[in-house]
Curated annotation (Swiss-Prot):
Composed of two chains; the small (or glutamine) chain promotes the hydrolysis of glutamine to ammonia, which is used by the large (or ammonia) chain to synthesize carbamoyl phosphate. Tetramer of heterodimers (alpha,beta)4. It comes from Deinococcus radiodurans (strain ATCC 13939 / DSM 20539 / JCM 16871 / CCUG 27074 / LMG 4051 / NBRC 15346 / NCIMB 9279 / VKM B-1422 / R1). It comes from the Bacteria. This is Carbamoyl phosphate synthase small chain. The active site is at C267 (nucleophile), H352, E354. The gene is carA. L-glutamine binds at S49, G240, G242, L268, Q271, N309, G311, Y312.
Length: 394
């Protein structure tokens, strides 16, 4: 019988799950969330939006197609930890360069397997996300990695989870944004668009380039004057991690830029636009994370299956003067998934139309963005709802 190194997942509510070590041997702490995608573990791990979080994959078997460098969404993993019912030690994929465990060991991703992930997800779904610690026995007891943690040791990790800082009210984009502006290379000349990087995924940049945009990625703290100095045709507000409320510098920039350029926001960028317009955001019980979220396009009546990753949402009713109108809603819980400004060429969605991983139902939004740029009349932007409701449809 093969002996496995012991590990535990200790939650701040006092629950302890006992399993086996995988990946980098050590300890980690973060907010425990779950993702319902059946594939795409590499894209999930390297998505900067997961900064500060320990991700539970609901699909029971993870890692059997290894890791391919071309599928990374950033230059390294940003997850604090990874949880699966079972990780595969072997892989079969002609595109892959290494196994999932080797990748985790290379980048310091502490993981646990062998726990009842169904029970964990039910707990998160009913009680909401919690802080947790993954601890490997070999890290604290290298002389006996196969032994059990004592009840007293488990309680130490429970307390460590409780003491960990909440992500609420904390600016996490400073840990993931680019330090310097850079231009993304394209094969053809197109419309220059400034991409505010709050934790942008590589695939989003690639999708924008595919529709004829020349992306210039800038740091999250970039000012309106610095943006306009680049002489762009449009502005894009990216995805990113954590609570949008403390990003007051971004709210200010989005507010001052509103109406000056056609603007498209995704995920955190969507939330920033809502806050910039005077609205409020709220933390969801367990968020939306996965590739199977149904969203209704209110302009066409069509239903899209979308890829999502967010723990906060915009309260549309809190935005004063009807500045934004709803364009998309989630069919599971009715939360806002998309909105458009009633006067300016500014629109946003809460989900990920680039879908990496996930379905491609919403990629038309990138085409609509370039259409808004082409139609923009130099500052008196045509209303994207009243003038032509179909322009955000399929």
């Amino acid at each position: 019988m093969i002996r496995k190194e012991r590990a535990i997942l200790a939650l701040e509510d006092g629950t302890v799950y006992r399993g086996y070590a995988f990946g980098y041997r050590g300890e980690t702490v973060g907010e425990v969330v779950f993702n319902t995608s059946m594939t795409g573990y590499q894209e999930i791990m390297t998505d900067p939006s997961y900064n500060g979080q320990i991700v539970t994959i609901t699909y029971p078997h993870v890692g059997n197609y290894g890791v391919a460098i071309y599928d990374m969404e950033s230059n390294k993993p940003y997850v604090r930890g990874f949880i699966s019912r079972e990780f595969s030690g072997e892989y079969s994929n002609y595109r892959a360069q290494q196994s999932l465990e080797a990748f985790m060991q290379q980048y310091g991703v502490v993981s646990i397997q062998g726990i009842d992930t169904r029970a964990l997800v039910r707990r998160l779904r009913s009680g909401g996300v919690v802080k947790g610690v993954i601890a490997h026995r070999s890290f604290t007891h290298p002389e006996d990695p196969y032994g059990e943690f004592t009840p007293a040791e488990e309680q130490i990790y429970v307390q460590r989870a409780r003491d960990h800082q909440d992500i609420d009210g904390f600016d996490m984009t400073k840990e993931v944004t680019t330090a310097l502006p850079y231009a993304f290379p394209t094969l053809r000349q197109g419309k220059r668009v400034v991409l505010m990087d709050f934790g942008i995924k590589h695939t989003i940049i690639e999708r924008l380039a595919e529709v004829g945009i020349e992306p210039i990625v800038v740091p999250a703290h970039t000012t309106p004057a610095q943006i306009m100095a680049l002489q762009p045709h449009g502005l894009f507000l990216s995805n990113g991690p954590g609570d949008p409320a403390p990003l007051e510098y971004a709210h200010k920039t989005a507010w001052e830029m509103m109406g000056l350029l056609p603007t498209f926001g995704i995920c955190l960028g969507h939330q920033i636009l809502g806050l910039a317009a005077g609205g409020q955001t709220f933390k969801m019980k367990f968020g939306h994370r996965g590739g199977n979220q149904p969203v209704k396009n209110l302009l066409t009546g069509n239903v899209e299956i979308t890829s999502q990753n967010h723990g906060y949402a915009v309260d549309l009713d809190s935005i004063p003067n009807g500045a934004f109108v709803a364009t998309h809603v989630n069919l599971n819980d009715g939360t806002l998934e998309g909105m458009a400004h009633s006067r300016y060429p500014v629109f946003s969605v809460q989900y990920h139309p680039e879908a990496s991983p996930g379905p491609h139902d919403s990629r038309y939004l990138f085409d609509r963005f370039i259409e808004e740029i082409d139609a923009f009349d130099g500052g008196n932007g045509t209303p994207i709802i009243k003038a032509n409701p179909g322009r955000l449809g399929v």
